[in-house]
Design a protein with these regions (language model features):
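"A position-specific structural signal for the A-helix of alpha-solenoid helical repeats
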Residues: 2, 43, 50, 89, ...
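Long hydrophobic alpha-helical segments typical of transmembrane helices together
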Residues: 138-183
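A broadly tuned, weak detector of single residues within folded domains
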Residues: 38, 84, 160-161
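Surface-exposed substrate-engagement region within the catalytic domains
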Residues: 123, 131-135
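Short coil/linker segments at helix-helix boundaries
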Residues: 2-36, 46-82, 92-127, 144-152, ...
């Protein structure tokens, strides 16, 4: 629950970093206690992934965070192949790395590929077609990898997300975020 509360709240950046790092650490304890529970692995990836997004790419890569995130997402999907959030996160993992360091280096060093980002994001949407975050994150992945070349496609995904009816408070926040991006 802490993970859901951190994202939309305007807070001190150091406090956010500390909280995301804490999520990753608690998830590691959960992984040790519940190694066959997919969400133990997923929340480690989530916490470390969000933490990584807040620090410099050089720092995140030097700390081995990309490998840890990928390892956790792979474990999640091995246990639960239809885990839509993990599919979305793995798509974004590929997109973040390709977008930040380029396709060739991303592929050779981390196995990250633009085509894999596309594949995982599309599968997440197929698994959860009414999920605003799956649409939003796919739009973000397109922009990270392709920039302005895919702006129209990304805008269409945001527009589709905005039209969805939220099923809970987090989805309402996701839709509000999409609306703000479109403004």
């Amino acid at each position: 629950s802490q993970a859901v509360m951190i994202l939309p709240q305007p807070q001190d950046e150091k406090e956010k970093l500390k909280r995301f790092e804490g999520i990753g650490q608690r998830a590691e304890m959960a992984m040790a206690a519940l190694p066959k529970e997919a969400n133990s692995h997923y929340f480690r990836a989530f916490g470390l992934g969000r933490y990584s997004q807040m620090i410099s790419i050089a720092k995140a890569l030097s700390q081995g965070l990309a490998s840890k995130v990928k390892e956790s997402l792979d474990a999640t999907l091995k246990l639960a192949p239809k885990h839509a959030e993990a599919q979305t996160a793995l798509g974004l993992y590929h997109a973040e790395i390709v977008g930040k360091i380029g396709g060739m280096i991303a592929s050779l060093t981390y196995g990250a590929k633009a085509a894999s980002a596309d594949e995982h994001c599309k599968l997440a949407i197929k698994l959860t077609p009414e999920s605003p975050i799956a649409l939003i994150e796919y739009a973000n992945a397109l922009m990270l990898i392709h920039g302005d070349k895919k702006e129209d496609e990304a805008a269409a995904l945001y527009a589709k997300a905005i039209k969805l009816k939220p099923k809970d408070a987090m989805e309402a926040l996701d839709i509000a975020h999409a609306k703000a991006q479109m403004a």
